[in-house]
Amino acid sequence: MNNKSNISIIGGAGHVGFALGLIFSSKGFNVSLIDKNRSNIKKINSGQIPFLEENSQKLLKTMIKKKRIYATNQLRKVIESKFIIVCIGTPINNKLNPNLRGFINFFYQLKKFLKKDHIIIIRNSISPGICNKIYKIIKSKCKNLSYCPERIVQGKAILELPKLPQLVSGKNKKAILESGKLFRKVCKKIIYTKVIE
């Protein structure tokens, strides 16, 4: 993809990020899918879906042909984007509770590439207080942090996302308004709410 990406999706070769990237690219955005899974990256860039996602195969080939979507393992590619959407996998401990330490620590890596005008969107389902911890990590570089959780059945995101209301909250007005404007391109209804800390 030669054009700069409007959107970078971290965890973009996973179930949540891949479908979201296809949806945004179909609305005219340039999307980079950033992920560590080299096998999925290779499949996506060759036009093959890495797992079952309804209505995705034809759409992926079309978006690649139009040069609106590509996958990479280079985190620094976020520099090219306005929006950074984070939906990386959250491991579960032996008591089946989410282990968010790795998720939180990831933002120290991301911070190296942040600019003050980035809009960072957390898509993961997280516990109260996590947004505040992340904000403390990144605020010296970027204060525009929003929380827009996904609520999609795996494998049916392309069908469901446009029909479901999207919750939008954040740490400042710019993050909230810009995130709402972005998701309004792909969702019928936006519901603004507060981050619970």
State the predicted function of each range:
Residues N132-Y147, I152, I158-E197:
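Internal alpha-helical scaffold of NAD(P)-dependent oxidoreductase catalytic cores
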Residues V86-G89, N124, K171:
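Glycine-rich, N-terminal phosphate-binding loop of Rossmann-like dinucleotide-binding domains
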